A protein has these predicted regions:
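Core catalytic region of metal-dependent phosphoesterases/phosphodiesterases
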Residues: 1-63
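Alpha-helical context
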Residues: 3-4, 37-39, 103, 111, ...
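Conserved beta-sheet core of the metallophosphoesterase superfamily
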Residues: 56, 67-69, 74-145
């Protein structure tokens, strides 16, 4: 989970139908399977409710020989890459999906399921064996890139 887990920030009202307590319960049931990072709208009070760590600015995931840098995107992104080589930087902060190559690194912006911007449809991505695929919510593949 790449941040902004329970709240969309104090400048935005919580949309009707969003059940933060229900989200906490559902996520805590899967706590042992979740890798999460902090978004710009997450706070220590959120961490007090969740049973998995989520306050780190990034995590480095290694899959075989591939390094994936997972972050929210408000600190590290395609304009401010992490130091050292990573095969992919994965984030979502802008809510604008993207799969592109930049100087030997795959840039993966997941977009947003709930709040897509820029006229985009809701999107999500999968990662399997070095391949990222962007999808619409109805399962239509939009683009695929291999690390």
């Amino acid at each position: 989970i790449l941040g902004d887990i329970l709240n969309y920030g104090p400048r935005n009202s919580i949309p009707e139908g969003i059940d933060a307590k229900g989200i906490v319960e559902a996520l805590n049931k899967r706590a042992n399977d979740i890798i999460a990072v902090r978004g710009n709208c997450d706070a220590e009070v959120d961490q007090m409710l969740l049973k998995f760590p989520m306050m780190g600015d990034y995590t480095l995931l290694v899959d075989e020989d591939r390094k994936l840098f997972l972050t929210h995107g408000h600190i590290y992104n395609k304009e401010k890459m992490p130091q050292g080589h990573v095969d992919a930087i994965v984030y979502g902060h802008t809510h604008l999906w993207e799969l592109s190559q930049q100087d030997g690194t795959l840039v993966c912006n997941l977009g947003s399921i709930t709040f897509p911007k820029g006229g985009n449809v809701p999107t999500f991505m999968t990662y399997e064996h070095g391949v990222f695929t962007a999808y619409t919510l109805d399962g239509k593949a939009l683009k695929q890139e291999r690390i």
